[in-house]
Amino acid sequence: MTDHIVKKAQECLPNIPLTVISQGAEALVFYTDVHPYANEPYLQNRGKYVIKYRPSKPYRHPKVDSSITKSRTVGEVKFMYKLNKLNINSPRIISADYNNGIIWMEYIGYSLPNGDVSSFKNWLWYLERNNQDCTSESVEKMCFKVGQLIGKLHLHEMIHGDLTSSNILLNDDEPVLIDFGLSSYSGLAEDRAVDLYVLERAITSTHSVYAKEYNQWLLQGYEDVHKHKEFGKQGQKKLVEVLKKLDDVRLRGRKRSMLG
C-alpha cells in the first residue's frame, strides 16, 4: 500500500473517513459510512458506501493523465448507469468526481462467517474449506444465477472485461457484478466468449476440485437466459455464435498452455 496515494485520496475527500478495501493496478477502493451529501437533513442517517479512486500516474504527462483519468471515470459511470437502468445487478451510483477519478456507490455484500467479504470466490472457498456440500442445490442455484446475470449482460452487448469470481459479489442471495474499469460495448461473439473464458479459467484455477460442476452450472444459466421470450430468436442465435467462439477460445488457450 502506498501511503501517499491514500493521502491524496483523503485530500480529494476532506472530512470523509476512509478504510481501504482493496488496491489494484488502476484504482483503490475504500469503505465509508458517510454519504457525499451528508449535510442534507434527509440524509443524516449513516449507511455503507464504497468509493473507487483512480490515482494520478506520475509517469504520464499531467495533461494526458488528467484526460485519461476523466475519460475512464466517465466511461465507467456511464456503463454502471446503463446497468442500473437495465436492472442488471450492479452497485447503484451515488455520486462522481470525474476530474479526480472518484466514483461513489452503494455498498454491496455482507461478511461471511469467517469475516471475509461475500464475493462469489470467497463464498465458494468458505464452503469448500468447511467441508460443506459443494454440489448441493443451493450452490447449483447460485452458479446458475451467476450464469444468467452474465448472459443478460452480454445480450445487451456489454462486456465486463475482467470477469473473475472476485468481481461478483453475493447480496441477499443474488449475484452482483462489480468493477467495470475494463468494461466495453461489443456485439462480437468473440468478445463475449473471451469474457466467459476468463471466468471459466478463474473458476478452474481457484476452485479446482469442483470446477467442472461450477462451470457447467454457470453455462447452463447463461444458456437459459438466451432462451427467454424477451430476447426471441435473436437470443438463441447469439447463444449459438458465442458457444462456437468459446470452443475456439478454449482451443487457443490450450495451445498457449502447451507452448508455454
Curated annotation (Swiss-Prot):
InterPro entries: Bud32, Kinase-like_dom_sf, Prot_kinase_dom, RIO_dom, Tyr_kinase_AS
Catalysed reaction, written as an equation: L-seryl-[protein] + ATP = O-phospho-L-seryl-[protein] + ADP + H(+); L-threonyl-[protein] + ATP = O-phospho-L-threonyl-[protein] + ADP + H(+)
Annotated compartments: Cytoplasm; Nucleus; Chromosome, Telomere
Gene3D superfamilies cross-referenced by the UniProt entry: Phosphorylase Kinase, domain 1, Transferase(Phosphotransferase) domain 1
PROSITE patterns given in the database record: PROTEIN_KINASE_DOM (PS50011), PROTEIN_KINASE_TYR (PS00109)
Any matching Pfam family: RIO1
Domain Protein kinase: 15-260
Transcription keyword on record: yes
GO molecular function: ATP binding; hydrolase activity; protein serine kinase activity; protein serine/threonine kinase activity
Active-site residues, Swiss-Prot/TrEMBL: 162
GO cellular component: chromosome, telomeric region; cytosol; EKC/KEOPS complex; nucleus
Cited SUPFAM superfamilies: Protein kinase-like (PK-like) (SSF56112)
Key words of the record: Activator, ATP-binding, Chromosome, Cytoplasm, Hydrolase, Kinase, Nucleotide-binding, Nucleus, Phosphoprotein, Serine/threonine-protein kinase, Telomere, Transcription, Transcription regulation, Transferase, tRNA processing
UniProt-listed GO biological process terms: tRNA processing; tRNA threonylcarbamoyladenosine metabolic process
Residue numbers binding ATP: 21-29, 52
EC numbers, comma separated: 3.6.-.-, 2.7.11.1
Record comment regarding domains: This protein is considered an atypical serine/threonine kinase, because it lacks the conventional structural elements necessary for the substrate recognition as well as a lysine residue that in all other serine/threonine kinases participates in the catalytic event. BUD32 has protein kinase activity in vitro, but in the context of the EKC/KEOPS complex, the catalytic subunit KAE1 switches the activity of BUD32 from kinase into ATPase.
Subunit architecture: Component of the EKC/KEOPS complex composed of at least BUD32, CGI121, GON7, KAE1 and PCC1; the whole complex dimerizes.
Family: Belongs to the protein kinase superfamily. BUD32 family.
Function: Component of the EKC/KEOPS complex that is required for the formation of a threonylcarbamoyl group on adenosine at position 37 (t(6)A37) in tRNAs that read codons beginning with adenine. The complex is probably involved in the transfer of the threonylcarbamoyl moiety of threonylcarbamoyl-AMP (TC-AMP) to the N6 group of A37. BUD32 has ATPase activity in the context of the EKC/KEOPS complex and likely plays a supporting role to the catalytic subunit KAE1. The EKC/KEOPS complex also promotes both telomere uncapping and telomere elongation.
Protein name: EKC/KEOPS complex subunit BUD32
Organism the protein comes from: Debaryomyces hansenii (strain ATCC 36239 / CBS 767 / BCRC 21394 / JCM 1990 / NBRC 0083 / IGC 2968) (Yeast)
Gene: BUD32
